[in-house]
Design a protein with these regions (language model features):
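Sec-dependent N-terminal signal peptides
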Residues: 1-33
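Well-ordered beta-sheet/strand-loop patches within structured domains
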Residues: 2, 32, 36, 51, ...
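Intrinsic disorder/low-complexity segments, especially N-terminal tails and targeting/processing regions
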Residues: 7, 26-28, 40-41, 53-55, ...
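Generic hydrophobic, helix-prone segments enriched in Leu/Val/Ile
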Residues: 25-28, 115-118, 130, 135, ...
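Cationic-aromatic interfacial patches
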Residues: 34, 39-44, 51, 57-180
Length: 490
């Protein structure tokens, strides 16, 4: 059973990144941002050979068995509905090995950690959150045990924030992603390996995102004067959002940036396909999540969500689904030219029932502010995307076969040879190909809560509960009356 880290736990440094780019028209006056170099990676700690234990005549009390607590796959997101509370009891009660003795630090490594903390502002974090002065005092005391305890505590805090992000779940509004490659044992191995190699800096740098977007934001932060605190905070927040994401997005993946209203297919770090997208209205915001796309459905039925079934009930073109007692359970819309999903939708199961699909109102892609859906992502030219993916890896679905299926008017599912991940994210700052930063409108007002948590020492972990936000109709009406200025550029 896996336990994700808190301030005093340990975690892994498994890292790999790919490219997401902002896609908007920009002004010639935008400032250039130089690309950053490759971030060094931490090497894996070598396992030690087990030493046989010899029994002694003296009887010793039995070592108590520690059992893992019943926790979800992401303790940073306790409200994540993907968590299955009925996991097998045997897995929940797996025995945990006895902990290793505390890691012992030398003064040189501890001072290296102090120096690292003092420059961590370059990655958008606050050095004071890690109390470097307190560690310096412990070093000067000459007490190795006290110094080691203080250094380990700060190493855990820093490594946690670099790998997972400083902002915790209560301030991550509508956040449903998890990173499965984190546990305390791997963090402990990272620490002990760094001490053995006398290279704290490399171990911590290896936790940083290596994605070009992160490098561009870091360069923008360095180029922004201290007096422009609002801009610096916005950049810092979006750097932290990159730390929220898994390091390995996949060799090939789709990423949707909601504030930017665009979807991108990335393969081997290169943008292979990118188009405009329509996201959820203020009253039905699109959440941040990840899912695995296994294929597409051609000529799909639209299963009307319960939350909006009143819009379809009894109307022409909608079909009721009745239960055994004859009562109407839900409403469906059959395939056809008026179907809200258009000709195709992606099969990407997830707890929020969010997916990419076509639309029967393609002219809406020309709108400046494209917050128009019930939460799903309407994607421009999505048939082209599906055709590419269905033909990849020797797929049998040729363009002619796809067209024949569409012409049949029948509902058909076509599967990809290799499923691929889809990430729906929320970056209010992003970089263009040349490194210039684009400011997107904070569509759902998610920035303030996350910004406040970024400035808290505990990243908002002490907040009462997640503040997942659904705007009221009044707020939606008020926002709709504002000018459509969702994009500003630098």
């Amino acid at each position: 059973m896996k336990t994700l880290i808190g301030p005093k736990e340990r975690l892994s440094s498994s890292l790999l990144w790919f490219t997401l780019l902002g896609s908007v028209a920009v002004s010639p006056a935008l400032a250039q941002i130089r690309p950053m170099g490759v971030v060094p990676q931490a090497t894996a700690n070598q396992p030690k050979t087990a030493v046989p234990v010899t029994k002694t005549p003296t009887a010793k009390p039995p070592v108590p068995v520690t059992r893992t607590p019943k926790v979800g796959p992401d303790t940073l997101a306790p409200a994540n509905p993907d968590f299955k509370a009925d996991q097998p009891e045997a897995a929940q009660q797996a025995q945990v090995p006895a902990p290793l003795p505390p890691a012992m630090w030398d003064a040189g490594s501890a001072m290296e950690l102090v120096a690292y903390i003092k420059q961590i502002g370059g990655d958008g974090l606050n050095p004071e959150d890690y109390d470097p002065e307190g560690l310096e005092t412990a070093i000067q005391s000459g007490n190795v045990a006290a110094m080691s305890a203080a250094a380990t505590e700060r190493f855990d805090q820093v490594s946690s924030d670099l790998a997972l992000g400083h902002v915790k779940k209560p301030a991550r509004i509508d956040w449903y992603l998890t990173d499965k490659d984190l546990d305390s044992a791997k963090q402990d191995a990272l620490l002990r390996g760094a001490l053995a190699r006398h290279d704290i800096t490399a171990a911590l740098n290896g936790l940083l995102p290596t994605h070009p977007q992160y490098a561009a934001l870091k360069a923008a932060l360095a180029a922004t004067p201290p007096g422009d605190q609002a801009r610096r905070d916005r950049i810092r927040l979006n750097m932290d959002r990159w730390r929220w994401l898994p390091r390995d997005l996949g060799e090939k993946y789709i990423i949707v940036n909601v504030p930017g209203f665009h979807a991108t297919l990335v393969e081997n770090g290169v943008n292979r396909w990118k188009q405009r997208a329509i996201a959820g209205k203020l009253s039905t915001p699109t959440p941040q999540l990840s899912a695995t796309a296994t294929g597409v459905i051609l000529n799909p039925w639209w299963e009307v969500p319960k939350s909006i079934e009143h819009e379809a009930a009894g109307k022409k073109g909608f079909v009721p689904v009745k239960g055994a007692d004859g009562s109407i359970q839900r409403w469906r819309q059959p395939p056809g030219p008026t179907n809200a999903l258009g000709q195709i939708k992606f099969v990407m199961p997830n707890s929020k029932a969010i997916y990419l699909h076509d639309t029967n109102a393609r002219s809406r892609f020309n709108s400046d502010t494209r917050a128009l859906s019930h939460g799903c992502v309407r994607t421009e030219h999505i048939m082209d995307l599906a055709t590419q993916l269905l033909g990849d890896d020797g797929g049998e679905w040729t363009p002619d076969k796809i067209q024949a299926a569409l012409d049949s008017k029948k509902t058909v599912q076509a599967n990809f040879v290799k499923p691929l991940p889809v990430y729906i994210v929320y970056f209010s700052d992003a970089a263009l190909l040349d490194g210039r930063i684009v400011d997107y409108k904070d569509l759902y007002g998610r920035d303030p809560a996350a910004m406040a948590a970024l400035k808290m020492k505990d990243g908002g972990a002490s907040l009462a509960k997640p503040v997942d936000q659904v705007a009221t109709p009044a707020k939606a009406k008020k926002a709709a009356a504002k000018p459509a200025d969702q994009v500003a550029t630098r």
